[in-house]
Amino acid sequence: MTTMQLDSDGRLRHLLTLEGLPRTTLLQLLDRAGQIRDAAVGRVGKRSVLAGTAVCTLFFEPSTRTRSSFHLAAQRLGADVLNFDASTSSTRKGETARDTLKNLEAMGVRGFVVRHPDDGAVEALAAAAGEGTALINAGDGRSAHPTQGLLDMLTLRQAKGTDFSKLKVVIVGDVKHSRVARSDLHALRTLGAGEIRVCGPVSLLPDDGMLEGCVVGQDFDAMLEGADALMMLRLQRERMEEGLVPSLEQYHTEYGLTCERLARAGRDAAVLHPGPINRGVEITDEVADGAQSCVLRQVANGVAVRMAVLETLLG
């Protein structure tokens, strides 16, 4: 974990990664998010915790769920929200991300929610930020997507309870290119998940030690046996080299989640997907829209999680 994430007293200063985040901090964020969700604060009314605080969503990559979710979260805490669009900004004239941040900081912005295509870009911006400015990583390259990891854990707690010690979780698909998978793996380990299984083509599994301690395999049907939760991952075609997957049809045949396959998992196994979903590739319509799908619950939990993070960092 980057040392700049916590201050000298161990308090969260930025949220850049879930790797190495203390278990107590992780649980505090999840507990607070659960309180917000259960109190329906995220759906009705408006709080004034961040009144007078300016928050900017600084996105250098496209996003629907994450950006909208952060905007709503900040707005519902009473913040003034700015939405930065790289396509219409001075970055098209050559301005660096660092200069963009420093200029917005000079205008009084104190919270930055940053998405960037490059690994480590958000950490570099955090290093350049002034005292009292907080950065939240909304996804950088393949590295991390900490709030997605948090909302996935909140969704698992909601579906399966807070004790993860006997939980069997299967992460399926393009793990190699997935920042979500990395954040989920760090969180599951910190929370003491009983068994983490990782399944996908060899060409889409990382070889950097990330899967240490996991049960790894290519036989999806075998990996499903007795699973309590399935985390289906999107094929990150925008980050892939050609030829890693022979065809989408073959991928679906080997790794697509169908109702027949889901029946192999544990009774009432929860199905998660970070979105956007490639229907008919990693998951069928029947499963995505079925009774065991937690996809929309994940989206709803995202607002509560991001409110909890913003409140913790800026409140």
Curated annotation (Swiss-Prot):
Protein species of origin: Xanthomonas axonopodis pv. citri (strain 306)
Family under the similarity heading: Belongs to the aspartate/ornithine carbamoyltransferase superfamily. ATCase family.
Zinc found in the keyword field: no
A family per Pfam: OTCace_N
GO CC, any one term: cytosol
InterPro entries: Asp/Orn_carbamoyltranf_P-bd, Asp/Orn_carbamoylTrfase, Asp/Orn_carbamoylTrfase_sf, Asp_carbamoyltransf, Asp_carbamoyltransf_Asp/Orn-bd
GO BP, sorted A to Z: 'de novo' pyrimidine nucleobase biosynthetic process; 'de novo' UMP biosynthetic process; amino acid metabolic process
Self-association and partners: Heterododecamer (2C3:3R2) of six catalytic PyrB chains organized as two trimers (C3), and six regulatory PyrI chains organized as three dimers (R2).
This enzyme's EC code(s): 2.1.3.2
Binding site residues for L-aspartate: K93, R179, R234
Coiled-coil parts of chain: none
HAMAP family the UniProt entry points to: Asp_carb_tr
Known role: Catalyzes the condensation of carbamoyl phosphate and aspartate to form carbamoyl aspartate and inorganic phosphate, the committed step in the de novo pyrimidine nucleotide biosynthesis pathway.
Lineage, opening ranks: Bacteria, Pseudomonadati, Pseudomonadota, Gammaproteobacteria, Lysobacterales
Enzyme class, UniProt record, top EC level: transferase
Protein name: Aspartate carbamoyltransferase catalytic subunit
